[in-house]
Swiss-Prot record:
BP GO annotations: translation
Lineage: Bacteria, Pseudomonadati, Pseudomonadota, Alphaproteobacteria, Hyphomicrobiales
Stated name of the protein: Large ribosomal subunit protein uL15
Annotated GO MF terms: rRNA binding; structural constituent of ribosome
Region (Disordered) residue spans: 1-41
Key words of the record: Ribonucleoprotein, Ribosomal protein, RNA-binding, rRNA-binding
Length: 156
């Protein structure tokens, strides 16, 4: 066997259908689009159109609203905090707050504060100062010998 003798497996490649290349090709002239009409023109698909059936976006009712005053917290898991401590990006001996998490690259932006969740394990004894935390997260932090200070009651 030589490199110039290597072929694809049978059925691995398929010849593409060349549309609009003369009537002898079998898919010339209208190129499989039928005759005239909206769907024969370029930009064929009509988004959300279901053939005259009432489309789903009109069948389903409107619901809810966007609260412009809603607080948006950045979620951080205990596992991410532990990984940052292990990588020596976070100093566990100092108080860890939103600014420290941002400097360590754990979060990108602070938004309305940081909320800590209990995903992952925490072995380091850390002192956290965050906007909120879940109850299991608080338990895990205290079990590891750390402490947590909540800055706002809204994120609980």
């Amino acid at each position: 066997m030589k490199l110039n003798e290597i072929k694809d497996n049978e059925g691995a490649t398929k010849n593409r259908k060349r549309l609009g290349r003369g009537i002898g090709s079998g898919s010339g002239k209208t190129a499989g689009r039928g005759v005239k009409g909206q769907k024969a023109r370029s930009g064929v698909s009509i988004n959300g159109f279901e053939g005259g059936q009432m489309p789903i976006y009109r069948r389903l009712p409107k619901r809810g609203f966007n609260n412009i005053f809603a607080s948006e917290f950045v979620v951080v898991s205990l596992g991410r905090i532990q990984a940052a401590v292990d990588a020596k990006k976070l100093d566990a001996s100092k108080t860890v707050d939103a600014a420290a998490l941002k400097a360590a690259g754990v979060i990108r932006r602070v938004k309305d504060g940081v909320r800590v969740l209990a995903d992952g394990e925490l072995k380091a004894k850390v002192s956290l100062e965050v906007a909120g935390a879940s109850k299991p997260a608080i338990e895990k932090i205290e079990k590891a010998g750390g402490s947590i200070k909540l800055l706002s009651a809204a994120a609980e």
